[in-house]
Amino acid sequence: MTSAAPAAAQFAAPAPAAMGIYDRRHHPLAAGVWGDHPFIRPDTTASTSNAAAAAMVVAPPPLTEPKFESQLALPLQHGDDQDNAAALQESPRHASDSFEQEASKPRDKIQRRLAQNREAARKSRLRKKAYIQNLETSRMKLAHLEQEITRARQQSAYINRSSNPATLPAPIDSGVVTFEVEYAQWVEEQGRQTAELRASLQAAAEGPELRAVVEAALAHYDRLFAAKREAARRDVFFVMSGVWRTGAERFFLWIAGFRPSEVIRVLAPQLEPMTERQAADVQGLQQKARHLEDALSQGMDKLKQTLADSLLAEAVVVSTSCDASPPPPPPEEEEPSSSAAGDGGCYMAQMGSAMGRLSNLVAFVDHVRHRRSPPPTSHLHVRRRAELG
């Protein structure tokens, strides 16, 4: 019996030690109540076989330890669970991104509407500016027409007040009026071309495009000279006096224009920087212009002297013939005006015949114009010519 008891003790004793880890959750009731040898009475005198059988029947089976490590490692062993966990972690992120996209859609729509409104406002301002410019141009044309009407009314009133037809002023040639209208249009077109030149320079236009703009500006000046030539054929005194210009411009006029040498002298500082060849060409052009101006001035002086001599020589003959003619019957009230009319008619006839000699001067001017050198800007680069335009 003594040998059987230790064997039973060896069988039942390890249970408390094995359950020591889980003593907080699973208390070993059998070990705490019955001691080291549970279910065995010390005063028992039964046989060893019966005690062993009773111990084996009554003794509880050993508790198995739960494998928490395997349970904790279980999610790491399954790929589907990892994917599910990643999906659970990413689902809030996708939800937030979709919410931000939904929230950004109204902002994008507002920005597009604001951009459309700004573009519409810009186009409206451009249309308003063009409309105002058209109104200003129309106003200037209307003012010019009003001036023409006022001038025509004054001339008609002066004609109506005159009593003697011989003292009437010469009628205004339609070519002169046409030149004044064309000159006003030419000035307006010149302003537009100047603005176009500046815009091309600021936009850094290419060579061919800029050259076309410069050539158009030069052709515009050629049209002015052609209009002057036609007006001079109608009324040379109108063109020579330059009544269509301002008082300051008329002070510097020379034969219905400005001296080319003076124009070159004013433009020369603006042509810098130039190469040595360009500077020599400009200087030679200025000297040639001065020689032609001197020749033309001498021709004008000779013409004036010829006209003065002709008028003085013919004045004696005219006055003698006018005095020798039988005087008209003296009217009662218009005697002074009739005598003045007779003298004025004689002198105006002689003046008209003398002014016929201006054809020589016209031929001389045409000769100079055909022999003129190219403009001073022809020696420069097209961009510098545009800057001077």
From Swiss-Prot:
Any one GO molecular function term: sequence-specific DNA binding
Classification via PROSITE patterns: BZIP, BZIP_BASIC, DOG1
Annotated GO biological process: defense response; DNA-templated transcription
Region (Basic motif): 109-129
Region (Leucine-zipper): 135-149
Record's signal peptide: none
InterPro entries listed in its UniProt record: bZIP, bZIP_sf, TGA_domain
UniProt superkingdom: Eukaryota
Family assignment from sequence similarity: Belongs to the bZIP family.
Role, per record: Transcriptional regulator involved in defense response.
Protein name: Transcription factor TGAL10
Biological source species: Oryza sativa subsp. japonica
Gene encoding the protein: TGAL10
